């Protein structure tokens, strides 16, 4: 067989089901081999969308997502999607075509230094120089992508290597690979675990901060056991949404810049903070000097580089969250059962829980607006009601784009199951929501997949309407349409003297006609009374469906200003954007005036 056929065999050996990609000249041997394979290839309309779809597939399923793009511009178009996966620790293998090995370094047609390009945004980079390397490199790539802290791995495929012959009997696909220098720690150090247990046992105001690492390790059941064993409140990061049902009485919601008041206040008042799979980003901590100043911090993370990077911790524990929590629960359970007298502090903890519950009750958000234009909170409320009415809570995946639509969902939507809320957290990539929904639906065909996006984010990858139309992928697209870059405008309004610049979409398309031009059902909703029925119609449809919600452009999110304390939550009240748009006639007038002045 040739190299390309060996690559297909290697993918099949990894039980890859689907590839998301876009072909090109440097990949023709690969696609020729793919033609003879049972592997499914989903042709996106842009390589960035292929990477986001592979990412959505990985987040929804826990499996490695695979994307592919040709050399040069195909590789550069993958970069944003791969960087998004890297920021959020999503397992991915990104394949790129490359010019023949003898032409590398000669500035050949569509040549680019793909290794240098991907190096900062992947766990590891490979370039296959000989066909005999194919089996081991592919096995190594998948091993690296899904072990330790997951993330993307890049393999560069020169065209001549795809065409050369390989004796697969002499170079079989290995079942295991030895990766020198790569040995992720999974078992927590016993001494550190004992220190953590001692701190937890002495706590009077304990709280858990659960991040994306809980979901990545599959530790949601262990987290729930720990929460209920100790009766400890829990808040999550954006990436941790879904690791515990947000309807649980001890769940406080998301913490941070756009976090809930109970989460932000309780974390700030805690005396022991148990952080699990969280990297303490600036969006979580706010002013680092005022972050959890009363608390002793226990930090559990599989990546030792994250511990102590942003926040000083008292008890660091490196390892897999699931395995560490199992051991913590085992030892705490033993202590509690052995001597209940040691639990005399329970009254103090119960007072803490009483205070937490009181804060939750006083912080219930108003969502039932009947205003026109529609308030985003009303859409979120009706979406949760429809999901309840249809009894699909455990069978629904939400993807979001980035901006106000993302934070309205993160703040107000009650996520109940793991891997059911997919969003770009670390990189904050606009354009992520729609293609990631495609990947999620392919990964979980029996689930209802609903993409929540803004008009700005949707337009960044709206060409993928062609993908869902061609393959009849029944995702529901909900556009929060305010004809504005809402989050940018909110910041300009709050922190830049209300000076509006480049935030209005005066030339946005008619999204209904755009969808219908692809043969996709679509509907515009302008009244709150239409929301419930429209959502049910779209969710029950077995075809793609686009809903365009005309939302109030003056709607804004409460937030913690950048660099402020978590308890410094401000209400954002703003007017309708009224930016003056400079039209082409004005651009031309200035050009001609400058031209005359130069004479």
Curated annotation (Swiss-Prot):
A Pfam family name for this chain?
A: TPP_enzyme_M
User: Binding positions for Mg(2+)?
Assistant: 455, 482
Cofactor(s) the protein needs: Mg(2+); thiamine diphosphate
Q: In which pathway does it act?
A: Amino-acid biosynthesis; L-isoleucine biosynthesis; L-isoleucine from 2-oxobutanoate: step 1/4; Amino-acid biosynthesis; L-valine biosynthesis; L-valine from pyruvate: step 1/4
Sorted alphabetically, the Gene Ontology cellular component annotations on this record are: acetolactate synthase complex
Q: Which UniProt keyword terms apply here?
A: Amino-acid biosynthesis, Branched-chain amino acid biosynthesis, FAD, Flavoprotein, Magnesium, Metal-binding, Thiamine pyrophosphate, Transferase
State which Enzyme Commission number(s) the record gives.
Answer: 2.2.1.6
Name of this chain's protein: Probable acetolactate synthase large subunit
Which gene name does the record give? ilvB
